[in-house]
A protein has these predicted regions:
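Preference for well-ordered, secondary-structure-rich cores of eukaryotic proteins
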Residues: 1-199
């Protein structure tokens, strides 16, 4: 693909990094009850939830890919969404998400599952199950993986296999050219994108 984005390898693209990160987050939660990092901030998460409230049925079967601590799913649950799943390839992330949800959200029925979309072996029980997929950072992590360790087609194919009929995928990590400067630092804002798959 001539216009493909080029990313450099980074420790953020390694399984070891995320296991260590979520091990520390889990320790912090057990010590002080803090839920930990909200990737791209609460505003980004709020925009995802706001969009889904407007556009999706409360009965839609939603999967958060790379769920981390499960924060966005808890927000959706609080807004009345009923069929929520979070998958992550880090066992510690899944343990953290389950612990937070069971301790702080006693009525929460979110299902958290250990799964790796960058491997061609997702559990058959997940295939063809979901109406909506959410991504708030997983594309970044996959893009930063050592390319010799990753077949570029597998994540795309595995995502398609997760879907029942149509895909509504909310990806809120794509950088824009909208630059700004504040306090002597330069930065970019982020945008949200929704993709609909018709197979």
């Amino acid at each position: 693909m001539d216009n493909a984005l080029e990313f450099v390898n980074s420790r953020l693209g390694t399984h070891e990094y995320w296991d260590k990160f979520y091990d520390e987050e889990l320790t912090n939660f057990e010590k002080n009850g803090g839920e930990g990092e909200i990737w791209f901030g609460r505003l980004c998460e709020a925009k995802m939830v706001e969009f889904l409230i407007k556009k999706a049925s409360k009965d839609a079967i939603i999967c958060d890919i790379g769920t981390g601590n499960g924060s966005v799913l808890r927000k959706l649950s609080n807004c009345g969404f009923l069929n929520l799943f979070g998958i992550d390839y880090s066992y510690k992330a899944i343990e953290l998400a389950k612990n937070i949800s069971s301790k702080n959200y006693s009525n929460n029925k979110i299902k958290f599952l250990l799964a790796n979309i960058s491997e061609d072996k997702l559990e058959s029980e997940l295939k063809g199950k979901f109406d909506i997929l959410l991504d708030k950072g997983t594309f970044d992590a996959i893009s930063l993986t050592n390319k010799s360790d990753l077949d570029d087609e597998i994540p795309r194919n595995e995502l398609i296999n997760l879907l029942e009929n149509e895909l509504l995928c909310f990806d809120c990590e794509l950088p824009t050219n909208n630059n700004f400067e504040f306090g002597g630092c330069k930065g970019n804002t982020y945008i949200g994108c929704v993709f609909k798959w018709r197979g």
